[in-house]
Amino acid sequence: MPQSIVEPRRIVLALLATLLAPTGAMSQALPFQAPGDSRLRHMVELDADDDRTPLTTTWPLPSADLRSDERDTMRGYNQPGSATDAGWFLSGAAKPTRLRTFSDTPREKGEAGLQAGWAAGDYAGGAIRLSYAFSPQDGMHYRLDGTYLAWRVGNWWLTAGVQDRWWGPGWDGSLILSNNARPMPGLGLERNSSVPFQSKLLRWLGPWRLVTFVDHMENHRADFNNTLFWGARFSFKPANSLEFGLSRTAEFCGKGRPCGLGTVWDMLTARSNRKYNANSTPGQNLVKQSAQVWAGDVRWHPGDLPVALYWQELGEVFDDRNLRPRQLLQLFGVEFASRYVASGRLRAFLEFADTACGAIGLSPGDKPNFGCAYEKDTWRAGYRFRGRVIGDSMDRDGRRLTLGAIYAYAPARSWELRLRRFDLNRGNIAQAGLVPQTVTTVAERIWNAELKVDGPIGDFRYSIGVGADHGGPLGTPAKWDGRAFLTVSRDWAQAP
């Protein structure tokens, strides 16, 4: 039987055995809150700006960082959030968007499945999601996306599963790691509670969190099968108003590639970013044995003002002899959050992102290097997984300006609106490596509007969204294009 089928079946059997084991947890929050619920994130950041939640730019978010009286109530609904959650979900979409945001919108035309949460005290827990995708873009019908198990050892969680991640302060995109691509199966180590160091030497860092993981990429890739994907992020908050994040990711190993301790050491120390492939053809440019990126970000909420500024930068090139990141991608944003507007809470944001290397520089002579971002020398399938880029959903050479708003009111109800302008694939490069640009192979300009509404109806939860695009390839007449989606779920614990 193919390895790609055997491994998921083993995972499913192990998870089912764990979920069916007797426990004393009845309404306990799970170890993590998954990314994808903008309403939840909006409420969490309101608490963070009041200094009641420590860190908010690294998702999944540990439930231990939520206030103790909110852990069972302030949670997302797109995936299981507590030990009593169990039910089914169904989604359908007409023309699923290729330009995903933090919000969990359907990637496929249709998907149906079962999900449940599980917890054993505060030392173990997880979620299981089994689904079937209709007409999947990557050909994978059966899925475990969102499934994980976690075991706590001291103040650390050991995790195994298929978890979505979002690193950075952006609402519309993350340059280094977003939920645009499907999650990969892997193992991780994450800090549980972001309590500060006790030592005087490091206490100034304030609340801090460390996350690291190793995931398994596709069994069959255009470059090297069974490549591994490593990520690490350190975030800290030295002042109540200021949160920093430092992130690294790398592709390594894979069929036909070295994968010993030396390879791992070179990756961790960034030596592999300056070592060249010994098999490079003489007379041609040497090919670096690297597939690493670095990102830094900051979110600043000045005093009691209802405003926050944020920034993220990704460097495509760096190494152990020159740690200064080069070939930079940039994301900037400003957000305004009100306490109460007509009995609800409003957050508005303006965000700009550019995914062309060096497009935004300090020198007047700086010019964008098209065909650079998310492309790699040796791993020439690039920074992508199952047909989608792992970072910002625009893929390389994009530019986006977004005006967005989130309005949360009543229990678990919210509206979300986005107005966006895209300049996609500005270099008009269809294919820089082994894989084409995943959004468009030609330069396009698109104006976009999207509306999303979430809430409960009786025992059911729904999320409904509509969107419209106006534009198309440069030099051609602009056209209108529409899309819509509906997601419905029901929690058996709430059923009569």
Label for each model-derived stretch:
Residues 166, 186-380, 396-403, 408, ...:
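Signature for the C-terminal beta-barrel architecture of outer-membrane proteins
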Residues 86-104, 124-136, 158-166, 170-174, ...:
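Transmembrane beta-strand segments that form the barrel wall of outer-membrane beta-barrel proteins
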Residues 22-24:
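N-terminal signal peptide c-region/cleavage motif recognized by signal peptidases
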Residues 15, 26-104:
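N-terminal periplasmic/intermembrane-space "pro-region" immediately following the signal or transit peptide
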